[in-house]
């Protein structure tokens, strides 16, 4: 049974209040769908860059953007490219998982890890936990920094963590639950590699499910990457480097304080950015995006630039076969998402349905 040791210190209580105030401030900002999509994508790219950089990835932010958005390849950076592609796909999967499930589960966590390690593959099998001992060493001195639990204990420890998250007290704030889950996952170190990235994705998933995703606009990873020594120092709790010699029962209040400070910092940063970017006079229409599937979101973004589209445009945007694209256009026409403006059977043109036009800039 997992029973984390921590206290709600004055610092934790104060930071939680700051987080709540910043959360409500952002929710009330006038953000149009196009701006929201832009800020969301920026946050994903930032998270991908910083989370992989923490683990030693050598790509710059510009190179990460290039790798994700184009088919171009960087010289002698194949491994780095695969890492960022894998993380980016896993990050997108977090969003869909949070809509499909009201709780975290073991299968999704294993799938996230598989995507992280999949090098950009979208079809993968869930990762099994490690079957042997792993050791975390200092990159310079090679001395042992942390000795995680034995492989035979990993499965039970993970199940205990997941059950704790599911059954955590109703009055325990989501940010604290996310902080504890991050710490415990990193402590268990259930895989040989990819533990840090998966821990941060798990944190993001819990925040999404708990409605602390801030519309998907912020990146905690940047906060960690700005001072890596502080991040690792905050995680390094307990009297010994050995899990069984104090780490499993250590008081993690200091880690929670650090984690919440990062949240407050990130929330404040995106508030400032969104205020600068948002346009006065618009009501927040971003709730529309949560009602649309990912395909419709992409088409809505297309209509930000163009007046009409054809099934060939749908083919290119969504990477579909011609027949599938035509069938989808017909379905959307029936749903009044699209409306016909040119009745010719060949190269038939559509415009956005009347109901949805008001959501464009």
Regions found by a protein language model. Give the residues of each.
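FIC/Doc superfamily catalytic core
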Residues: 1-361
